[in-house]
Regions:
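Soluble non-cytosolic domains of exported or imported proteins
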Residues: 28-36, 67-71, 109-114, 165-173
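Extracytoplasmic/secreted envelope proteins and their assembly/folding machinery
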Residues: 38, 42, 74, 113-120, ...
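Active-site histidine-acidic residue metal-binding/catalytic motifs
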Residues: 1-73
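A short, glycine/acidic-enriched catalytic loop
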Residues: 12-29, 91-118
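Active-site-adjacent mobile loop/cap segments within catalytic or ligand-binding domains
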Residues: 4-6, 12-19, 75, 80, ...
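Active-site-adjacent substrate-binding region
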Residues: 110-135
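Surface-exposed patches in mature extracellular/periplasmic domains of secreted proteins
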Residues: 52-57, 88, 129-136
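Loop/turn elements at helix/coil->beta-strand transitions in domains of secreted/extracellular proteins
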Residues: 1, 45-53, 80-85, 130, ...
Length: 192
């Protein structure tokens, strides 16, 4: 199985959501968390026999108009012929006490929804996070412009202190859960 991993945001141009310490200084960035989880998930998937390609960029499609970032994530995944696509992110909800994990797919009843369900179940079961469920988000670029089953994982709320601590210390647990979700999806599809 060919798995395309897209850690969310960009290390240089758009760090995504952040967590700040008691002094108001940024101590955790979404792009860093996603990159670390993605790299570990890649290792676990390769150990399970998957071919894995990973690209972290905020250039999602060729029409994104980022001339300084020539490779577009969705186009690269499509051209490579990935069997599944997983985008890894951290959620944020400034000014609220939101917590937990949710996974987004393009539409209900699709292979992308099945992939999202398998990853969501593994993350909630392994990390005991609040289960915010699988949600349909057809407007998201990485779900709309990929040719293969795709999902976007919101691991936890980076701006919630308790979730931020889990993100800070649980990289490996998140990565293992994502990898197991992908292999659970693969096993389900093979059994059909």
């Amino acid at each position: 199985m060919k798995v395309y991993i897209n850690p969310g945001h960009d290390l240089e141009y758009d760090s995504g959501a952040i967590h700040t310490d008691g002094n108001g200084d940024v101590d955790l960035r979404e792009c860093d968390v996603a990159a670390r989880i993605g790299a570990l998930a890649k290792q676990y998937l390769e150990a399970a026999g998957c071919q894995v390609r990973m690209l972290q960029s905020d250039n999602l499609c060729n029409d994104s108009e980022y001339s300084d970032r020539p490779v577009a994530v969705c186009d690269d995944a499509n051209d490579w012929g990935a069997d599944v696509f997983v985008s890894i992110h951290c959620n944020a909800c400034a000014g609220h006490d939101a917590r937990g994990t949710e996974t987004w797919c393009y539409a209900e009843g699709t292979d992308g929804a099945l992939l999202a369900e398998k990853i969501q179940a593994q993350m909630v079961g392994s990390l005991d996070t609040t289960d915010r469920g699988v949600k349909v988000m057809p407007g998201l670029m990485v779900l709309k412009h990929t040719d293969m089953p795709a999902c976007l994982v919101e691991t936890a709320f980076i701006d919630n202190d308790a979730d931020a601590e889990l993100l800070r210390t649980g990289y490996d647990d998140f990565a293992r859960a994502i990898a197991r979700g992908v292999t659970d999806y693969q096993q389900t599809k093979m059994a059909q």
